Curated annotation (Swiss-Prot):
GO cellular component, one term: cytosolic large ribosomal subunit
Subunit (UniProt): Homodimer. Part of the ribosomal stalk of the 50S ribosomal subunit. Forms a multimeric L10(L12)X complex, where L10 forms an elongated spine to which 2 to 4 L12 dimers bind in a sequential fashion. Binds GTP-bound translation factors.
SUPFAM superfamilies cross-referenced by the UniProt entry: ClpS-like (SSF54736), Ribosomal protein L7/12, oligomerisation (N-terminal) domain (SSF48300)
Keywords from the named record: Ribonucleoprotein, Ribosomal protein
InterPro entries, per database record: Ribosomal_bL12, Ribosomal_bL12_C, Ribosomal_bL12_C/ClpS-like, Ribosomal_bL12_oligo, Ribosomal_bL12_oligo_N_sf
Origin organism lineage: Bacteria, Pseudomonadati, Pseudomonadota, Gammaproteobacteria, Methylococcales
GO molecular function per UniProt: mRNA binding; structural constituent of ribosome
Family per record: Belongs to the bacterial ribosomal protein bL12 family.
Species of origin: Methylococcus capsulatus (strain ATCC 33009 / NCIMB 11132 / Bath)
Name of the protein described by the UniProt record: Large ribosomal subunit protein bL12
Record NCBIfam families: L12 (TIGR00855)
GO terms, biological process: translation
Pfam families assigned to the protein according to its UniProt record, in alphabetical order: Ribosomal_L12, Ribosomal_L12_N
Keyword Ribonucleoprotein applies: yes
Length: 125
């Protein structure tokens, strides 16, 4: 009498974790294979397709120009980053410069809006 896959799966689902570990060890010995090799291959195949589907979750705000009103842009940079006057001035004058890195889309859009209102040209990457 042949045992169906459903019967095997039902039996395994009723086993404890230790019994399953023993079963896997016995199968490795009987068939001369390693379960670790099969597990290591599966994530590689899944990982190869994942980057095409992944959505970007972290964004960088990059100021490309400070425009005509540098003082207002420096004030906005100080408010956003908490930098001192000299550091904020150096950041503004060193365009293109990264204002913030690894932030959410909403926060990046908020910072972009504040800087554009102050007169800066900003990209979210």
């Amino acid at each position: 009498m042949a045992v169906s896959k459903e019967d095997i799966l039902e039996t395994i689902s009723n086993m404890t974790v230790m019994e399953i570990v023993d079963l896997i060890s016995a199968m490795e010995e009987k068939f001369g294979v390693s379960a670790a090799a099969a597990v290591a291959v599966a994530p590689v195949a899944a990982g190869a397709a994942a980057p095409a589907v992944e959505e970007k979750t972290e964004f960088d705000v990059v100021m490309t120009s400070f425009g005509a009103n540098k003082v207002n842009v420096i004030k906005a940079i100080r408010e956003i980053t908490g930098l001192g006057l000299k550091e904020a001035k150096d950041l503004v004058e060193g365009v293109p410069s990264t204002v913030k890195e690894g932030i959410s889309k909403a926060e990046a859009d908020d910072i972009k809006k504040k800087l554009e209102e102050a007169g800066a040209a900003v990209d979210v990457k």
